[in-house]
């Protein structure tokens, strides 16, 4: 710890990312990346942009990308905010809408960046305990003092919360912002975007990292009423006006436009997810129902951490969280069918030896 650090720097406990190995032979099922490449139209846009456009600053407002996303969701451009990945959008949203003296509510088992943001911005927060089956009790989000954030589908569980439940939470917090983090919504859930017209306190946050295969480009966005987006822009432009580079913006536009390719890839992930769930069930694993591109699994006989280590020895990475209530679970990203077949072969051999 350095004497030059501020008190905030000394006190903060940073988020820990999933491992990014250099070895290309490793099967990476630990960070919920898409196993399929971006649309060919995305790759062509990147090639074209790299020829001359890099000498110019990007559009600070990302107007063309905002229009593209707005058209896709039947919104206006003024109802779209673009950020450098959904993590930046989330961080700016915490700063824009939550006050230090008012308690924010989010689930005790959810995206572990939320408490990092809350601590960084000196926000009070309350952890709403999930039920035994990891479902949300919406009563825990009733009349919050400072607002709420819901991950839907939840991470790391993959459980989806119905739109009726989202509506109830919005109505119970009509004077506070409710954020719905929809990083994984495209793998089987129904988005809350349709509710924006009726709920001025709703902010929906999405990413192109998962379903559009652009994790390496860092494109996230928020959708909500104009006054919410104006607030986000005030904060963003107090940090950095140019958060999105030219190439990323052009790639994102083509990724949104190529609906056919998007549907093809997400359908393959969903089919492979269902196949993997079925195969794991045959060997005694319990799987939380998932609407994401990952599954959350446990076994009554074998310890999750032991399986984690053995899988790593076999060049297969999955995610383990050494936390209360979930320390005997593994989160497994859904890879290609071929990758998941290898995963199944490895895990069968491992549990036979444990």
UniProtKB/Swiss-Prot annotation:
Annotated coiled-coil segments of the chain: none
Entries under Gene3D superfamilies matching the protein: Aspartate Aminotransferase, domain 1, Type I PLP-dependent aspartate aminotransferase-like (Major domain)
Cofactor requirement: pyridoxal 5'-phosphate
Domain of life: Bacteria
EC number per UniProt: 2.6.1.9
Keyword Glycosyltransferase (UniProt): no
Swiss-Prot/TrEMBL catalytic activity: L-histidinol phosphate + 2-oxoglutarate = 3-(imidazol-4-yl)-2-oxopropyl phosphate + L-glutamate
Protein name, per record: Histidinol-phosphate aminotransferase
């Amino acid at each position: 710890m350095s004497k030059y650090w501020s008190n905030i720097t000394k006190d903060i406990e940073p988020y820990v990312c999933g491992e990014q190995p250099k070895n290309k032979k490793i099967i990476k099922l630990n960070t919920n990346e898409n196993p399929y490449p971006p649309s060919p139209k995305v790759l062509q846009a990147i090639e074209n942009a790299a020829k001359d456009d890099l000498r110019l600053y990007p559009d600070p407002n990302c107007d063309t990308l905002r229009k593209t996303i707005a058209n896709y969701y039947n919104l206006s451009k003024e109802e779209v905010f673009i950020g450098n990945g959904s993590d930046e959008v989330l961080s700016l949203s915490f700063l824009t809408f939550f006050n230090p003296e008012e308690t924010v509510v989010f689930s005790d088992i959810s995206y572990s960046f939320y408490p990092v943001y809350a601590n960084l911005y000196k926000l009070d927060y309350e952890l709403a305990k999930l039920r035994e089956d990891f479902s949300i009790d919406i009563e825990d989000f009733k009349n919050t003092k400072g607002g709420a954030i819901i991950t839907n589908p939840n991470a790391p569980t993959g459980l989806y919360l119905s739109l009726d439940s989202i509506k109830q939470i919005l109505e119970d917090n009509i004077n506070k912002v409710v954020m719905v983090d929809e990083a994984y919504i495209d793998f089987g859930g129904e988005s809350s975007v349709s509710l924006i017209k009726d709920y001025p306190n709703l902010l929906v946050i999405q990413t192109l990292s998962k379903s559009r295969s652009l994790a390496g480009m860092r494109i996230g966005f928020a959708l909500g009423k104009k006054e919410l987006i104006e607030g986000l822009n005030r904060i963003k432009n107090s940090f950095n006006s140019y958060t999105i580079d030219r190439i990323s913006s052009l790639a994102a536009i083509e990724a949104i436009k190529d609906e056919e390719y998007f549907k093809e890839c997400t359908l393959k992930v969903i089919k492979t997810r269902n196949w993997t769930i079925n195969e794991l069930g045959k060997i005694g694993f319990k799987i939380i129902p998932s609407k994401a591109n990952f599954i959350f699994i446990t076994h009554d006989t074998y310890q999750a951490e032991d399986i984690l280590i053995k899988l790593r020895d076999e060049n297969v990475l999955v995610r383990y969280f050494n936390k209360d209530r979930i320390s005997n679970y593994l989160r497994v990203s859904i890879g290609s069918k071929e990758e998941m077949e290898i995963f199944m072969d490895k895990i069968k051999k491992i549990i036979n030896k444990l």
